[in-house]
UniProtKB/Swiss-Prot annotation:
Residue intervals passing through the bilayer: none
List of residues binding adenosylcob(III)alamin: 207, 228, 258
Biological pathway: Amine and polyamine degradation; ethanolamine degradation
Subcellular location: Bacterial microcompartment
Signal peptide from the UniProt entry: none
EC number: 4.3.1.7
Species: Escherichia coli O81 (strain ED1a)
Protein name: Ethanolamine ammonia-lyase small subunit
Domain of life: Bacteria
Cofactor note text: Binds between the large and small subunits.
Known function: Catalyzes the deamination of various vicinal amino-alcohols to oxo compounds. Allows this organism to utilize ethanolamine as the sole source of nitrogen and carbon in the presence of external vitamin B12.
Gene name tied to this protein: eutC
Catalysis: reaction(s): ethanolamine = acetaldehyde + NH4(+)
One Pfam family this sequence matches: EutC
Amino acid sequence: MDQKQIEEIVRSVMASMGQTAPAPSEAKCTTTNCAAPVTSESCALDLGSAEAKAWIGVENPHRADVLTELRRSTVARVCTGRAGPRPRTQALLRFLADHSRSKDTVLKEVPEEWVKAQGLLEVRSEISDKNLYLTRPDMGRRLCAEAVEALKAQCVANPDVQVVISDGLSTDAITVNYEEILPPLMAGLKQAGLKVGTPFFVRYGRVKIEDQIGEILGAKVVILLVGERPGLGQSESLSCYAVYSPRMATTVEADRTCISNIHQGGTPPVEAAAVIVDLAKRMLEQKASGINMTR
């Protein structure tokens, strides 16, 4: 599927929702104010700001314009300069700040108020707290007994597509991208004439939990939107794991199709929704997912 087809799907889905599709845009570095190298290392600078990300720490550069262009072209840690064999103070502080942000999003909880505000049913895995979630991934792959009963009682049975949202390893990925990915995704699936299950939120879920969900609800395709393990300074990245006719005993990782890096600096959520709709349709047509699908 090429870019033109993706844009057509996005326009079609957004039109059905009564919204205007966003204009196509190229992925660009979000840094600004890169006019010239800056050597000031003010302690008052917000280390998460665009100004801090645009900072060029190379002193007395031979070609300042080359550094400026390089800095504009990537979000990587380039042009930070050195103090002898060591990084400069601001570069080190930014590294530590980004590391702290990544740790925070792993340890944070998705607020119960947020889940209720979205009108989502909330269930959980066998995990009871964040510490256990990080140390016992096997328990995050199974629903607790109460969750199983709740799904049987409150969710649509035997859907063509079941959409599940889970916090995973990034709370920010869910709360930041939810509004831009779930409404167009649900609208696109319904517009395609598919029977769509009741979307719900799984707290402390791991990827393999979608196998049990699919088995309980009799879903043909299960789509799990889960927070990715955050990188330095990027804590908002979402992944989609889609699988056809999952079974706890037989489904393996090669049976899943993954779309990763869903966020404003990667694959935009609205565009990802269109790609996921197309993927679900192809899975149902081919009755397969993962490496068993024909490209």
